[in-house]
Amino acid sequence: MFERISSDIVAAMKAQDKVRLMALRSVKKYFIEAKTAPGANDELSDEAALKILAKLAKQGRDTAAIYVAQSRQDLADEELAQVAVIEEYLPKQ
């Protein structure tokens, strides 16, 4: 999963897709933090990666709801666009 995110970051840079790039860089940051956590042995299982992705998607949706409540639809739209990118990596439900 980590390698897929890294290669998709390169593709987003080449395509100059700023929203996708921001979302994927955020995901990679959390993956690196999980890999370097004490006891992680510099590894990240797919199960742990999916938990991180689900957490980030939920946080993004919650943040967007707060933005809407504060009449900041522009920020909510940006946040929801990033959530959509993250949800591409989650299994379909």
Give, region by region, the residue ranges found by the protein language model:
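Charged, compositionally biased, marginally structured helical/coil segments
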Residues: 1-93
